[in-house]
Each structure stands twice: as structure tokens, then as C-alpha cells.
């Protein structure tokens, strides 16, 4: 009750009173001069009372310092009543004011003790709530108070808009400011209390008990509490962010994130659960929960927005989230003039809730405390949710317009429900940290859903600021962060669908890349750097991870980039040819081994099961044996090490491998050899087709601007005759061979009369450049240009949902109880001395899958038409295979990393020689001359 009396003495009102703002603003503005005349008298009175105030504050500070030792006694009366078997008094206003303004935690208090105390109170409250309905009553009381404060802010805002242009409209009456400040701090503490109880319920109960706790067991008066709670929070957050409501915005964004966190404590839905027709039947007065394992608050919000797609509250809420992301407004400092005007004692009482707020959400914590981060987390949760009827927030996201695009603004109807933001400011906010997990996911959804943002990104001339940090992640963290790598590849694939992007990245020159360790890259185009890293990723994936999803995405990006390859750097050209060499060796080796397996002499019909297993293991070894070196086989011990790792991981991740074995490279010993042959040969044939198509298109249409690629191919043309007998590869190989034969023949005649000293790399490069310009360029064949387009799969939530919530788990600044989280694996921080955050990129969702269900990244990459001059038409659809269990990948990587690096260094010796010839003028050998 202390705050109520203090507010009255200070000229304010208790939380819950209405404000006649127009009259109050007018009357108090008239009294401004009188208030100014009384300032000196007030200062004198303050000086006279300084001694009393000092004594009061000293006593208060002493009480705070000792508060941790007697929480049970000082706060037990009200809290014990709240959590007991007895019902709360009818006058909740008085009871909650006394309880909430007693919440004060000093900065030195023991956090574990406080959280333990609150958890114990939550446990007692929940155990008695079905009988007492105390939690339901304070929820309804909180909703009413929040709605009342929301209405006060709306009234003040409308009043200030009416007085716009007046000199006095910027001056908020001091008594109104005091009341708003008091009411906000009251609701801040109220939110913290409700959030604590709600969080305990969500973390420790199943969906049925959660619904019972929030709606009551039998009383219809509480049935709409979850709906009313979500609607009231959404209504408040739809208001403009102001200094007088900043703290409450902050805690409500955290609170709604807690309510949505039921998704962390439920397994991913099965196909049958995913396509339930009606998850909720919502009415404003009553609703019924139908679905099992339902995310109650997310479904309520989705159903509400789905049934009211043009709700201005929803659009204002989303608009404010984007505004928060763009502006990242810092928390306001407490006004000294405000505290001075109400006296030190009263201001201390008003600061009690603020101290509790700072205790639970300390601003010195580096994670999860900015308004940008909280808004991003909430936005990601909303757009990623797999709502059976279709996520309405993704539709809202797709309709957001660029307010800087004047043409659309002139043609648009201001009465339409539309969101307009600055795409420039949003883009600049994202590229401040383009490689962070939350920004990568936000960028993915914006590029995928919003055409305005997509067009704006394509128009930027500084794409290196966006792409280089992502490319660096692909280079440095390809093995350690598979989820993040997959999202980056998808983002680049979406961007590469536009020819303007491909043209820009190939024309943008990066002068030096310091983080690239293999070579000193100087004056390489951004597109060239991207190609080099993608090729390195493919080679690494072939030798270790063997994940076809990564192959598909990397090759699709390379294919899209190939339509604009120009003045390719020697090192980039060598790496592209190296990729062709490795794929060719794998293809030849695999085909040879499969022919041996298919031979009757290799199969004993009396012992078919054993032979199938042995032969499959041999094929697996042959696939792994083609390393990134020039050698055709690995050491036997190395092959056995790979095999042991696969067997070990298979036993650890049995339920995950059930869904992966059908699509991983030769993981299943029981796989029928005929099916294996068809699958693996087809996959490698498709990969080779793409690489050959890239080379063929470049030589056919842009040979004059890529002499370094021709030079590199002349060193490795022995692989092309191998594919002349392959049905889908023969036309491409034949066309490439014809072009290379032309250069070889012309080169042979040109150097016949030259001495060995005169036959330098510079001479040969000059000759290639001259001859390439004389090659006839056929008319562009649109059907022959490789075009890959990204399409999101219907099961993409299986990949993204755990990813989103693991990021929130790590970076929201919230203390989560890990023992019941089922969406992704966690570490019990209480059992280790130096806890580290859960890696958001290395987890496997805890989901019970049937054998025919796949866990895969959200990719479905297809080519439309892929033909070239002198080649046959072919519509190719790359097989989408799931990502292997991340822990399987990591164990392989940790054991083979050093070995693979040594092999790559040895395998690149020939590339070094070719590149050195191209760049320094070293002479070709006689054998290379004749080729």
C-alpha cells in the first residue's frame, strides 16, 4: 500500500485510475508558470528535509542489503497466500499493489537463490491452483490492468496528435508523466511475476496440464484467458515504442516469447499431426482445444490472425517489430527532474519495480537484451511456425512494401492494411552482423517471401559487405556448423537466381582476402572467391561428409554463377578443373567396382547376405578411396577408420539413422546392390553433368574472356574421352573436346618453329587469347543455360524450427530448464563447472520418426532446362537427400581433419604448377605442349 499513498501525496493516481487526458493536459499547461514560480520554494523545502531523506535512504539501503537473508519472512505473507490452498481476497488491487511493490532484488543478491525461491513458489501455486484458481484470477487482473494502461497510452497519443502544431503539445504534464511511470513499473513487476509462474508451468507440464492451469478445470469464466492474454499483449505491443512504456515493451516481448516456448517442450509433429484440419475453434467468448500436443499460445495467435487477416493490431505489431529491428532504440534513462519533483522517498518506492526489472534482465548481459534481438526472436518464431492452415505471418511478410519506393506509394490506397518500411535501413541493420544466426534466418525469410527486399538487395553495389562474412563461414566452419552452412547456401542460391546478382559478383573485385589460407588471393572477383570456396566445400563433402544436399546446393550456385563467368582468375579456373578431375575419378572407380559386384563370379548365391554386405563395404571403401589428392586410393587403415566411425555413429544415433540410411552415400549394408548402383551412378552422373555444362557453356559463349580456363583444361583433357560412351555426358564431352582440340591443333602448329626458350607460358596465353577471340560465338541458347531455382519443401520446419529455438535458447538471456526440452539436445548446466552454450548449428531434433520420414534442410533445388550447342536436351532433377546426423559428421571431421589437409596439400601440387605457369611464365613440358 506504500506506493498508493506515495502517489497520492505526489499528485499522482494509483495504478488503475483513468485519465481525462485532454482536460488534464490543458489545465496543467495553464499552470506551468505557477509551477515554475514555486520551484525555488520546493528547493528550499527539499534542503530542509535533506536530513530526514538521508536517514530514510540509509535505512532503505540497509534493508536491501539484508533482504536475501530474510526473503522468506518479509515476502512470505502475501506470496504464501498466493501459493497456498486459500483463495486471494476480493480486493486484488490492494493485494497486488502490496505484493508487487515489495519485489526488489539488489544487484548483489544470489541469483540461484532467488530463482530457486520463485520456482518453489511456482510449484506450490501450481499444485493448489486447480482448487483455488489464484493463478487464473491474477491473470485476469493482469489482463485488465494491461488493457487499461494501453487505453491510457492511446488516449494520450490521440490527444497529442490533436494538439499537433501547438507549442505546448510537446510538454507532457508532470502529474501524467508520474502516473504513467508508476503504472508502467507496476505492470513491469506484474509481468515478471506472471512470466515466472507461466514459465514454470510450460517447462514442467504437458500440454493438457498447461491448458488446465491457464483455463481452470471447470469454470467457463476462465476459458478465454489464454486468448485474452495473447490479445492484450499483442494490443499493447502494437503501440508505438515510447520512453514511458519502453520497459514494459521489453518485458512483454520476453513474456510472449516464454508463452511461445511450448514448442521447445514438444516433439516435432508427425505427418498425421501436422495436417490436422482444425487445431483450434476460437470464439471471442469461448474456444475449445482440439489438437493433441498443441502449442496453445502459438495456435491461438495463428488462428486469430488467420480468421482476421486485416486486423490493424496485427499489422501494427509486425510493423513495430521491424521498427525495433531497424532502430534498436536504447532504454531511456530515468528522468532526474521527474524523481526530484516527487521527492526522494517516493521516488525510491517507484524505483522498487525498476530494481526488480534490472535484476531479472541486467543490461550488462551481452546477449538477448537489445530491443532488436528480442524483436528478431519473436519475428522468427512467428514466421517459422508450421501452422496446418498456412502461416498467416508469412503472408504478411510477403506484403511488406518499401516506403522509399515512391511509385508504389503513389498507387497504393492509404486505407489498405499495408506495412511500409525502409528496405535500405533494414538491409543496413542486417549487414551489421550478416553472419549471426538470427540475421541469417531473418535474411532467408525476407529474400524468400518479400519481393521488395529481394529487388533491393540485388540493386546493391556493395554485395561484398553481405557475402564475404557468409563466404568466410563456409570456408572456416563448413564442418562445425552444418545448419548455418545450409542456410547460407540457400540464401546465396536464392540470390543467384537473378542474373543481375551474378553479373555484379563477377564484376566486383576484392583486392585481398586475408582469411583464405591455401593461397594469397589478390584482385579476385567476388564471384571467383565464392566459386573457390564452393568447390572446396564440395571436395571436402565428397571426402568426408558425403551429404548430397550440400552437393546439390553448391553445384546449383556454381551453375547459376556460370552464366556470367568472365575473366576467371587462374586459381579459380584450376579449382574448377580439379573438381571435374575428382568427380571423374570417383565416377570411374565406382562404375568399375559396381561392375565387379554385378559380375556372377563375385556373388555367391549360397551366401548372398554375407556377400552383399562385403561387396557393399568394398563399394563404400572405393567411394572414400578417391581422395582430393591425385592418388586413386586411401590407406587401408584410413578406410577402416572411416568404417569404424560410421559403425560407431550408427549405434549411437540409431533412431536418426533409420531415417537417413535410405539417402546417405552407401551407409546401408542391406541396400540392394541394383538400387545402390542406380542411385550412386545417377547421382554422380548428375554432378558431372552440371560441371561439364558449366565448362561447356563458358567455352561456347565466353571463351574469349576466359583464357585461363582454356589453359587449365588443356592440361586435363584426358578425362573427356572417358565420357563419350556415357549417354547423358557424351554430347557435352564431345563439344568440349572439339573446342580443346581446336586450340591444341592451332597451338601445335604455332610452336613448331619456336625454340624451347621461346615457348613460355606467356607466349601460350597470348596465343590462346588471340585464338579465342576468333572463335565464332553461336546465338544464345536459353534452353542451354543452367538455371537452378530454390523451392522450400513442405517439411522445412523439421530443419528450421529446432534451429530457431536453439538460437533463442542460447542468446535470449533467459534461464531455461533443460531437462524437459525435446526439440533439440541440451546440456544440464548444473552438472558442469564451466558451462558453454549449446551450439545452435550442431544438434539433432528429438523426434520420433518412422522409417520413411526424412530430416533434411529446407531445400528442393531443381534445374529447368539444361542444354547447350551440340548437346542433347535434358531436364534434370537432382535428388534431395537429407543431411546426415551432425554428430556423425563432427566425429568424422575431428578424426580425419589433419589427414585430409595433408592429402589436399599433396593433391594440389599439380595445380600449383599450372597456376605458376599461367602467372609467372614458367615453360610447359614437352608432353604438355603436345597436349
UniProtKB/Swiss-Prot annotation:
Record keywords, A-Z:
Lipoprotein, Myristate
A Pfam family of the record is Dymeclin
Task: Indicate the family of this protein.
Answer: Belongs to the dymeclin family.
What protein name does the entry list?
A: Dymeclin
Concerning InterPro entries, the annotation shows:
Dymeclin
| Sequence ranges of Polar residues compositional bias | 839-858, 919-931
Q: Where is the composition biased (Low complexity)?
A: 27-49, 601-618, 859-876, 889-901
* This protein's GO CC annotations: Golgi apparatus
Q: Which residues form a coiled coil?
A: none
**Is-annotated flag, keyword Lipoprotein?**
yes
Q: Which cysteines are joined by disulfide bonds?
A: none
What PANTHER family has UniProt attached to this entry?
A: DYMECLIN
Listed under GO biological process in this entry are:
Golgi organization
Residues of the region (Disordered) are 1-53, 599-618, 839-931
Q: Where is the lipid attached (N-myristoyl glycine)?
A: 2
Q: Which gene encodes it?
A: dym
